[in-house]
């Protein structure tokens, strides 16, 4: 990728068992299949993400789904300064979010994006709570 910016990979270590999770949900449309979607754990947080009502996530967060080989796909994203500060303040893991980042999809996830010809219909960050053992898991540590 020939880019003006350096994209940093968002690693799995930002997901901490026993804490609420922000889930990146991507709906694809087009290609050889209909209604392809992905749910990707994005970030463990101390409290739910709340954005101002008058704004949409797309005002703060832009994604681009691109091939990273013959059968693998990366999701690139650019994060507005407001959302960047908000996510880093909510994150369980200290300051993991940068303005320009990407996620590597595994083969199964990549297959969905490829079948939809990388055509993103919509995306969102959804707050997911912890299960009944979350507090116990959190106190015992990973």
Swiss-Prot record:
Organism listed in the record: Borna disease virus (strain V)
Localization in the cell: Virion; Host cytoplasm; Host cell membrane; Host nucleus
GO CC annotations on file: host cell cytoplasm; host cell nucleus; host cell plasma membrane; membrane; virion component
Membrane topology: Peripheral membrane protein
Upper lineage: Viruses, Riboviria, Orthornavirae, Negarnaviricota, Haploviricotina
Record keywords, A-Z: Host cell membrane, Host cytoplasm, Host membrane, Host nucleus, Membrane, RNA-binding, Viral matrix protein, Virion
Subunit record text: Homooligomer. Forms homotetramers. Interacts with phosphoprotein P. Binds to ssRNA.
Pfam families: Matrix_Borna
Domain of life the protein comes from: Viruses
Described function: Plays a crucial role in virion assembly and budding.
Protein name (record): Matrix protein
Predominant location category: virion
RNA-binding recorded as keyword: yes
InterPro entries according to UniProt: BDV_M, BDV_M_sf
Molecular functions (GO terms): RNA binding; structural constituent of virion
Disulfide bonds, paired cysteine numbers: none
Coiled-coil boundaries: none
